[in-house]
Amino acid sequence: MKLEDYIATIENYPKEGVTFRDISPLMADGNAYSYAIREIVQYATDKKIDMIVGPEARGFIVGCPVAFELGIGFAPVRKPGKLPRKVISVDYEKEYGVDTLCMHADAIKPGQRVLIVDDLLATGGTVKATIEMIERLGGVVAGCAFLIELDGLNGREAIEGYDAKVLMNFPG
């Protein structure tokens, strides 16, 4: 299946000069969505994963069904103020400033093998911050899986040394 056919391209969104890749059409098509999830599940199967971690919000959309299919748990990564219990956090550089991500301090147990799942790999800031939190909690990042990688934005540099699966590539 050619998943690229299920990605909408919106020019100048969310701001002038940005090309947005919208996964909504992929999610709206049961066959395409299921195919994408199965591809990530297949990637994860040999890695002996204990936990899926997904950054908000689209990491939930992709990561939760993967966790369900694997019969394992899911841990969310969120912006400050969105998680009710004790959290750990990481500040990370974005294109125009600094942002913060958080996860529950008890989300990952030492030694757990974790797969990070998100919709998009661009500059790698989000995944790098997520890796930092998982490793701070004693987890082992066994891999990263993305629906889309935007080429030319150096996201791979952020995950250098980590195994990664990307289902589609688009110009960045």
Swiss-Prot record:
GO terms for molecular function: adenine binding; adenine phosphoribosyltransferase activity; AMP binding. Keywords: Cytoplasm, Glycosyltransferase, Purine salvage, Transferase. This is Adenine phosphoribosyltransferase. The keyword Transferase applies. InterPro entries: Ade_phspho_trans, PRibTrfase_dom, PRTase-like, UPRTase/APRTase. Homodimer. Pfam families: Pribosyltran. The keyword Metal-binding does not apply. GO terms for biological process: adenine salvage; AMP salvage; purine ribonucleoside salvage. Pathway: Purine metabolism; AMP biosynthesis via salvage pathway; AMP from adenine: step 1/1. Gene3D superfamilies: 3.40.50.2020. The gene is apt. Its EC number is 2.4.2.7.
